Amino acid sequence: MDKKCVLITGVCGLLGSRLSDWVSENKKDYDIIGIDNLFGGYLDNISKDVIFYNRDLAEDKIDDIFEKHDIEYVFHFAAYAAEGLSPFMRMFNWKNNSVSTANIINCCITHNVKRLVYTSSMSVYGHGDLKLNRFDENDTPCPIDPYGISKYACEMDIKVAGDQHNLDWCIIRPHNIYGEKQNIWDKYRNVLGIWMYQILHNEPMLIYGDGEQSRAFTYVGDNLECLWNAAVLPQASKQIINLGGITPYTINDAANILAEIAGYNKIEHREPRHEVKWAVPTYQKSIDILGFKDTTSLKDGLTSMWEWAKNIKDRPRYKWENYEITKGIYSYWK
């Protein structure tokens, strides 16, 4: 164990693979250790610089990885981020989020990791304070789906580990991240990626409900240095920080921007699903502590991602064969 290391879980997904690229380019004095079960990520997303372990954090022990490598910082990104699907896959959701996080917490405590950076979710806010226009870190979380509940439970567990075992942590609440290396073949999550798949396969771009839901989309490249800062800056210690784009768009607006970029005109509305109407977090704390800069407009970010999507190899689209429950499931998922 000669060289200091960072560990990234979910390393083959969007955020993990892109952060591993950033660390490889900008922090050459660190080795990059990556863990992924390859359920929603792809091995060809990562470079050969990553020391990769194919492990399932919900099932497998990982102490041997910590014993083999001098891991200073852990970025825990591994999760299955499908809020709308989670009411129909509660057990899977809980294992992949809460059980895997407990595994990581135990290892961070046992092996004296300097800091754990955990990506939670804006889903912990639920509907938020309907009198306000944005979710603030000081708001009391009130999630409305099993995914948000599990992410909030993980936050609380990490805080307890900090209080009882002196584990240093920073909790990031990212929102609506998109960009190159995103899984566009999963029909249950990542609306911008779903639309790109639909365009590439000459299917209508589907909007659930009236499309007036508000979201602040985040180009992944704008977040990477901030995530590193969450691990290393003293002022980020034991902070909860929203991280992402500052400009709200309706789903209709986002669909129209992408349709214009792709030269596409098939957009259809389907039955609404159980989700919050507006989800736009505050951002000042990320600027003050992490140095966040919202530099990429939605149009520019989608243009870049679309050029990437047109030129990557196609993959089979993922569909759940067996939901845990089917009562009340949406017609477009049957």
What do the PLM-derived regions correspond to, one by one?
Residues M1-P174, W333:
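N-terminal Rossmann-like NAD(P)+-binding domain of SDR-like oxidoreductases, especially those catalyzing
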Residues S86, D139-T140, I171-N183, I194-T218, ...:
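A conserved pocket-lining segment of Rossmann-fold NAD(P)-dependent short-chain dehydrogenase/reductase
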Residues R90, I184-W185:
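Active-site loop immediately N-terminal to the catalytic Tyr-X3-Lys motif
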Residues I104, I158, W195, S286-I287:
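Structural element of the ATP-grasp superfamily
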Residues V124-Y125, I177-G179, N223:
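Conserved sequence/active-site signature of Rossmann-fold short-chain dehydrogenase/reductase
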Residues A153, D157, A161, V191, ...:
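Hydrophobic alpha-helix immediately C-terminal to the catalytic Tyr-X-X-X-Lys motif of short-chain
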Residues L200-K334:
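C-terminal substrate-binding subdomain of Rossmann-fold SDR/epimerase-dehydratase oxidoreductases
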